[in-house]
A protein has these predicted regions:
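A short helix->beta-strand "capping" segment at the edge of beta-propeller domains
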Residues: 16-39, 112-116, 167, 336-339
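Beta-strand-rich domains and repeat architectures in extracellular enzymes and scaffolds
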Residues: 32-76, 347-350
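Beta-rich, blade/repeat-based domains predominating
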Residues: 37-47, 74, 97-135, 169, ...
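Short, conserved, GDST-rich strand-edge loop motifs in beta-rich repeat architectures
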Residues: 54-75, 145-146, 194-218, 302-323
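Beta-propeller blade signature
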Residues: 74-84, 155-161, 215-228, 320-333
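Short loop/turn segments immediately following beta-strands, especially the blade-tip
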Residues: 157-165, 269-274, 372-378
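Loop/turn-rich, solvent-exposed surfaces of beta-rich toroidal or solenoidal domains
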Residues: 285-339
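Blade-level signature of beta-propeller repeat domains, shared across WD40, Kelch, NHL, RCC1
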Residues: 348-390
Length: 390
């Protein structure tokens, strides 16, 4: 009865929070935002740092199930934005008229990822989430994408750079049944790490409501897994947590940082020898989402305020942006000291340093905010994305 009462309360309380009006083109002209976007949930710099790649995450109706009814969700996409002038190029699903991105991809002798990958994703069902840019030991740039559409998998693309960025699908790593992944990060020693946020959230059934209860009360719902070509997917010891969300790997691979959304904390796993990693954490005032590195080797994290009920309510918003509060933090990876850089409204899910700006994306919104980095610059030249050994 207690669970049933909670389920009824959760369903009733997940109302719509404040709605921000649609992004004004004048904001884009003034260099304050990139407008006319669709849920820019995660961002990453592309090689050369002239463009960013944006994961535009589709939103499901609260009662829809994309697996059972693909038509219930409009597919998401991967978009490139040129920072200098805001020019845009859709990277995936490919444009049928674009000769640089033929689809289906031509047969290739070299496939990346798991040999059990059944083939390319269905563009009509593509639902991207967390992303990460890296390079392999041969210097080939690549993009990892968590995809929920048609299958739960990490899709792997090779990044091309002709006159503008392009993507070539190279393979995938299917995820186990009963898991809903959130974010992915390349590992410098090979493969990647990926967060298992929770069991799949489908509609407003009792399973979803129970998972929501577990997250709201800080109970464990998921963990972090590492994939390598040799060992496959393995859960990392000491990594279980409440709604593991964003993830980042230290450039030397000795530490992994995880945004524990349900616990409002960032935890660090330190690897020293063959035993379980050591774990410590720093508490935040917001529920942390995606992580990114600054040039001076600190972590940026955007987090939402208001808790799970407010976040669920964001799904009812049809235009503009969800107006829940957010905070952006810089975290020292050595001391785990967290410094709050700025606050705002707009359901922020990622903060990315670009020159003297911090770009802020949203999981329910139509814009990327362009904020001046506090103190003129968040970082100084230094850390760069790590190469991977595979």
């Amino acid at each position: 009865l207690g669970v049933l009462a909670f389920a009824l309360e959760l369903t009733a309380c997940a109302g719509s929070p404040e709605t921000l009006p649609p992004c004004d083109p004048a904001q884009e002209e003034a260099g304050l935002a990139f407008c006319d976007l669709r849920n820019p949930e995660d961002l990453a710099l592309l090689p050369g740092h002239a463009w960013i790649v944006v994961s535009q995450m589709a939103r499901l109706d609260a009662d829809a199930n994309a697996e059972a009814d693909p038509a219930s969700a409009r597919p998401g996409d991967l978009l490139a934005i040129r920072l200098a002038d805001g020019a845009r190029r859709r990277l995936f699903p490919p444009n049928a008229a674009d000769p640089d991105t033929p689809w289906p991809p031509p047969p290739s002798e070299e496939r990346w990822g798991d040999g059990a990958c059944p083939g390319p994703p269905d563009p009509a069902r593509f639902l991207p989430h967390g992303i990460d840019v890296g390079s392999d030991h041969r210097g080939r740039a690549r993009l990892a994408v968590v995809n929920h559409g048609g299958r739960e998998a990490v899709e792997i693309f090779e990044i091309g750079a002709r006159t503008a960025p392009s993507l070539e699908w190279r393979g995938c790593v299917p995820m186990p049944e009963g898991m809903m992944m959130n974010d992915v990060a390349w590992h410098p020693a090979g493969g990647f790490v990926v967060t298992n946020f929770s069991p799949p959230l489908e509609g407003r059934g009792l399973g979803t409501l129970w998972t929501g209860f577990e997250i709201m009360t800080g109970r464990e719902t998921g963990s972090v897994l590492r994939w390598t070509p040799d060992a496959g997917l393995v859960e990392i010891g000491n990594s279980r947590g409440s709604a593991p969300n964003g993830v980042a790997v230290a450039p030397d691979g000795s530490e992994i940082f995880v945004a524990e959304w349900g616990a409002k904390s960032i935890f660090r796993l330190r690897f020293d020898g063959d035993g379980e990693p050591l774990r410590d954490a720093v508490a935040l005032e917001h529920s942390p989402d995606n992580l990114s590195w600054t040039r001076d080797g600190r972590l940026l994290v955007a987090g939402q305020g208001g808790g799970m009920l407010k976040v669920l309510g964001c799904n009812e918003i049809e235009e503009g942006a969800c107006g829940i509060d957010y905070g952006v933090y810089a975290i020292d990876p050595v001391s785990l000291e967290a410094r709050r850089l700025f606050d705002g409204k707009g359901a922020a899910s990622v903060a990315l340093e670009v020159d003297d700006e911090v770009l802020v994306g949203s999981f329910v919104g139509d814009r990327i905010e362009r904020r001046t980095a506090p103190g003129r610059s968040v970082g100084s030249p230094g850390a760069q994305p790590a190469e991977s050994a595979d």
